[in-house]
C-alpha cells in the first residue's frame, strides 16, 4: 500500500512538471517555434479544430514560422484564427503557405513575460507540494488504521520529500532555461 502511494505521488509529480513545461512552451519568445501555435483553434466545418490538424507548422528562419494549410479553402480562416489569438502575430498569405514573422520583443514585454513564466513555475511548485501533502496524509491515514508503523510513515514521508525536492528542482531548471531564452536579444 505504501509503495502504491509513493508510485502515485511520483507519477502525479511528473505530470505537474510536464504541465508546467507545456504552459511555459506557450509563452512566446523572440525565437520561432512550432509549438507557439499549438493552442490556436480554427473553425473547420462548423467546429473548432486545432491548427495542427488542418495545417503543418514549420520554422522558416529564426523569426519566421511557415504554416502550410492542407485545404486551400481554409487559408483565410487560418489567417483569421492566428490574428485573433492573443499572441500578437500578423500572418501574411503567400499562395498555399502562410508566413508569420515574429516581431522582436521589447524590454518591457520581456519583463512581463518573465513575470508570467515565474507565475507558471510557482503554480507548478504548488501543484507538486499539493501532491506531497496528499501522499503524506494518505500514509498517516494508513498509520491510524494500524496498517503501517510510525517508522514506515517517517521513511515514506522522507522519500516523498525527496521526490518533491527533485521535481521542484526540475521546474526551477525549466524556469531558468525559459528566462535565459526570454532575455536573449
Swiss-Prot record:
Keyword Protein biosynthesis: yes
Signal peptide interval: none
Pfam family, one: RRF
One of the GO BP terms on file: cytoplasmic translational termination
Cellular component GO terms, alphabetical: cytosol
Subcellular location per the Swiss-Prot or TrEMBL entry: Cytoplasm
Keyword tags: Cytoplasm, Protein biosynthesis
Role: Responsible for the release of ribosomes from messenger RNA at the termination of protein biosynthesis. May increase the efficiency of translation by recycling ribosomes from one round of translation to another.
Similarity comment: Belongs to the RRF family.
Protein name: Ribosome-recycling factor
Organism per entry: Shewanella piezotolerans (strain WP3 / JCM 13877)
Amino acid at each position: 500500500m505504501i509503495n502504491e502511494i509513493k508510485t502515485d505521488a511520483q507519477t502525479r509529480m511528473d505530470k505537474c512538471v510536464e504541465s508546467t513545461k507545456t504552459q511555459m512552451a506557450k509563452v512566446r519568445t523572440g525565437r520561432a517555434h512550432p509549438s507557439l501555435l499549438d493552442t490556436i483553434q480554427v473553425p473547420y466545418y462548423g467546429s473548432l479544430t486545432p491548427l495542427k490538424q488542418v495545417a503543418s507548422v514549420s520554422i522558416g528562419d529564426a523569426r519566421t514560422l511557415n504554416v502550410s494549410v492542407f485545404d486551400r479553402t481554409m487559408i483565410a480562416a487560418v489567417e483569421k484564427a492566428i490574428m485573433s489569438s492573443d499572441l500578437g502575430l500578423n500572418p501574411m498569405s503567400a499562395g498555399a503557405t502562410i508566413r508569420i514573422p515574429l516581431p522582436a520583443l521589447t524590454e518591457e514585454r520581456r519583463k512581463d513575460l518573465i513575470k508570467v513564466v515565474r507565475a507558471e513555475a510557482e503554480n507548478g511548485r504548488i501543484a507538486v507540494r499539493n501532491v506531497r501533502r496528499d501522499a503524506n496524509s494518505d500514509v498517516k491515514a494508513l498509520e491510524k488504521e494500524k496498517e503501517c508503523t510510525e517508522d514506515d510513515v517517517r521513511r515514506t514521508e522522507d522519500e516523498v520529500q525527496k521526490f518533491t525536492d527533485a521535481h521542484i528542482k526540475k521546474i526551477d531548471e525549466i524556469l531558468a532555461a525559459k528566462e535565459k531564452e526570454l532575455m536573449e536579444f
